[in-house]
Amino acid sequence: MINQKKIAGEKACEWIKDGMVVGLGTGSTVYYTIEKLGEMVNNGLHITGVATSEETSKQAQNLGIPLKSLNDVAEIDITIDGADEIDTDFQGIKGGGGALLREKMVASASLKNIWVVSEEKLVRNLGKFPLPIEVIPFGWKQIERTLEKEHVQTILRRQSSGEIYVTNNGNYILDIVNQTFRDAEMWQEKLAQIPGIVEHGLFLHYVDIIVCAKANGEIELIKK
C-alpha cells in the first residue's frame, strides 16, 4: 500500500540545503520529513532545526538534528509542516495536532513555507475539518458562550483518557465544528476580537509551496 504521507514528507527535503535554519512542523506527515532529515544529517548535512512542539523536538533530538529555539535565530530559511485542510486560495486550517500557536510563530519567521499533504487535504472550501482555537484556561467557558451567541458550535478538546487536552503552552483548545469558512478573512478578524483567544488555526498568508502526494504515488507541486 502506498504511503502518501511518507512520499510527501520525504519529497520536501529536496528543498533543504547545507547551512539552512529549518522550521520543523508537527504531525503525521511531517514526521517523515524529520525522519529523512535525520538520515541526511547523519550523512553529513549541516542544518539547524527549530521545532514547533515538544513532540517534534524529541523526535529531532533522537535523530541527532541540532536544534535552537525561535528566540535564538534571526530568521528561518524554510519551514516544512503539514496541514489539516488547504483550499484553492492557499488558505489552510492547521492545529489538529495541537501545535497551532508555535507553528504559526515559526511560519511567520520563515522566508519560505512548504506544506506536505496527501491529496484528500485539498478542498474547495475550508470547514470539513474542525477549526482549533487556542484559549487560556481562565474563562474558557466564557469564550465558548461568546461563540455560542454567534451560533458557532465548539467542542473542548480532550485526550483519549477524557482529561482536558493541554497545549505545550499550558492552554486549552476549543474546536469549532459544523462550520464552513468561505470568508476566512472575516473569521480571522472575528476571532481576533475575542479576549482570551491566544491563536486560531486559520493560516491564510503563509504557504508558498504545497507538496501533495496522490493515491497512485505521484507527487504534485502546487506553487503560489
UniProtKB/Swiss-Prot annotation:
Pathway where it operates: Carbohydrate degradation; pentose phosphate pathway; D-ribose 5-phosphate from D-ribulose 5-phosphate (non-oxidative stage): step 1/1
Key word Isomerase present: yes
Pfam hit, one: Rib_5-P_isom_A
EC number: 5.3.1.6
UniProt keywords, alphabetically: Isomerase
Catalytic function, reaction form: aldehydo-D-ribose 5-phosphate = D-ribulose 5-phosphate
GO MF, one annotated term: ribose-5-phosphate isomerase activity
Residues that bind substrate: 26-29, 81-84, 94-97, 121
Keyword Nucleotide-binding set for record: no
GO biological process, one term: pentose-phosphate shunt, non-oxidative branch
Active site location: 103
InterPro entries recorded: NagB/RpiA_transferase-like, Ribose-5P_isomerase, Ribose5P_isomerase_typA_subgr, Ribose5P_isomerase_type_A
Subunit structure and binding partners: Homodimer.
Family named by the database record: Belongs to the ribose 5-phosphate isomerase family.
Function comment: Catalyzes the reversible conversion of ribose-5-phosphate to ribulose 5-phosphate.
Record's protein name: Ribose-5-phosphate isomerase A
Protein source organism: Listeria monocytogenes serotype 4b (strain CLIP80459)
Gene that encodes it: rpiA
